[in-house]
Amino acid sequence: MLRYLTAGESHGEAIIGVLEGAPAQLPLTPDDINEHLARRWLGYGRGGRSKIENDTVHIYSGVRFGKTLGSPISFRIDNGAYEKDKAGWPEKMAIEGEPPEDMEKVTMPRPGHADLAGKQKYEHDDMRPVIDRSSARETAMRVACCSVARRLLNEFGIEVGSHVVRIGDVGFDEPEEWADRRNALIEEGGGASALYETADESATRMIDDGMTERCVEHIDQTKKDRDSLGGVYEVVVTGVPPGLGSYVHWDRRLDGQLVQAICSIQAQKAAEVGDGFFNAHRPGSQVHDPIEPREDGAQAYPRRTNHAGGTEGGTTTGMPLVVRGYMKPIPTLIKPLDSVDTATGEPEPTRYERSDITSVPAASTVAEATVAYTVANAFLRKYGGDSVPAIRRHVEADRAAPNE
């Protein structure tokens, strides 16, 4: 099974990651990871840090001559802001010594951020450690670690893609409004990669040009209003075999794991599998996906619709996995909100810390990564193996076995 840990602060020298459990003999190069690190900076409405960072992963172990070894893989991504920013981060984030005498402590928590909760939990008198570790900068390393899982899925014809369906008040209201376009892209391209490639061409990662233009205008107006925006995105996984996940234990249910994967990302406050929220107010006859006869040699029974999002009983059906994430507006606003200075106990307005107007497009690419990691773990649980050739033998045996 895969497991990864990340370490590092947003304005420290670097962020670090370690991934264990990756099978041996998996083709892997830094380019496989850097492609998706670059995509993480996509999207209209990003802040100043996107002009400072140029994320490139360094692999220090677990890979030799372009293939994984089966041992832990370690990564490093340097923080460009550490040296390029003129705020004196090498001194403010020093590992040793004492704080600079002129360093101002952060004592004003921002509503909606981890500042106050982290200060109280870890008893910091300065919220800078909370701000820097809870920052979405950490997701760069998540994307790096999870890109290995994505590369593993690709070896077996499983692809992951995403697109944005709403930013603030602008976007689609019902899944049927974008499903045909999404499905056509996937069918024409042969998998979910075609979905993300098309979305990446849009300033807002949407697959509808008219909606992209409206969202850009909405973001521009929100910037003038000194506010921020959240939104909704959809992640799709194609090529998934039936039987991943399980109904026999609560923690093996794949739909529950997918929701956790989305909501573990900073600022994501809700998730649904398939048409979950919409299904709640529809009659069952319009929700459940009719089963059709399968072709000779096929593993999965096709469904006329996919409102369930590719799972039933926490187990994959063979239909594409569909999961949506709901992101709250970024809590760092140009417009001050009411807060309290924890050093004095007096009411004070918040101060602005560099941020985006919206990062929903970026969040959708991070969600691709966490979903890929989750599906890869379910895949390994079913098929197992210490190397890619061993896993391939297990997959081929499963496909060849009669399954009534």
From Swiss-Prot:
InterPro entries per the UniProt record, alphabetical: Chorismate_synth, Chorismate_synth_AroC_sf, Chorismate_synthase_CS
Positions of NADP(+) binding: R40, R46
Source domain of life: Bacteria
GO cellular component term, pick one: cytosol
Cofactor: FMNH2
Subunit note: Homotetramer.
Designated name of the protein: Chorismate synthase
Lineage: Bacteria, Pseudomonadati, Rhodothermota, Rhodothermia, Rhodothermales
